């Protein structure tokens, strides 16, 4: 395979990284406005992200791309597998505000952050500007999470 194929793979990983963060923004905005039914309907779309990330990781492996891309690409795949298992296979609705966090939620959040760090680092392996773009997208996603938490706490105080 040529170097050009590796470049296209990198661009696709960056693109799907941006899609990943955009979908998380949508999920947190839906939660903020208490549209859980719509969020639940979106969960298969979120889980479908597993397909391009796995395919791109396998292609990176097959063309012999450097091990750095393989290592930093793996955490997002692990997170998406866990998310797929939790949402679609167990058919459990997420429990967003427990008094005591169950171990599954702790694992979920750790995998989300580790996957995001890996995804952002992949961007930096490609170029500084792509890495920065993914980090900015991560903070936009975290801002939408903060908005969701703000709305939740505000509604809780109103009760």
Predicted regions and their residues:
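N-terminal signal-anchor/start-transfer transmembrane helix
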Residues: 7-34
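Terminal transmembrane helical module of multi-pass membrane proteins
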Residues: 113-159
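Hydrophobic core segments of alpha-helical transmembrane domains in multi-pass membrane proteins
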Residues: 15-20, 69-81, 128-140
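Membrane-interface helix-boundary motifs at transmembrane edges
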Residues: 29-43, 62-67, 91-99, 122-127, ...
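Transmembrane alpha-helical segments that form the membrane-embedded catalytic/substrate-channel core
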Residues: 22-26, 80-88, 138-152
């Amino acid at each position: 395979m040529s170097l050009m194929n590796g470049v296209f793979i990198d661009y696709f990983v960056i693109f799907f990284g941006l899609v990943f963060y955009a979908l998380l923004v949508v999920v947190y905005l839906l939660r903020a406005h208490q549209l859980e039914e719509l969020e639940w309907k979106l969960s298969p779309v979120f889980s479908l992200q597993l397909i391009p990330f796995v395919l791109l990781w396998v292609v990176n492996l097959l063309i012999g791309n450097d091990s750095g891309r393989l290592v930093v690409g793996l955490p997002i795949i692990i997170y998406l597998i866990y998310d797929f298992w939790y949402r679609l296979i167990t058919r459990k609705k997420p429990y967003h505000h427990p008094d005591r966090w169950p171990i599954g939620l702790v694992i979920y959040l750790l995998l989300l952050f580790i996957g995001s760090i890996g995804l952002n680092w992949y961007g930096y392996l490609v170029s500084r500007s792509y890495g920065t773009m993914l980090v900015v997208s991560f903070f936009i996603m975290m801002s939408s999470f903060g908005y969701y938490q703000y709305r939740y706490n505000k509604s809780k105080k109103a009760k």
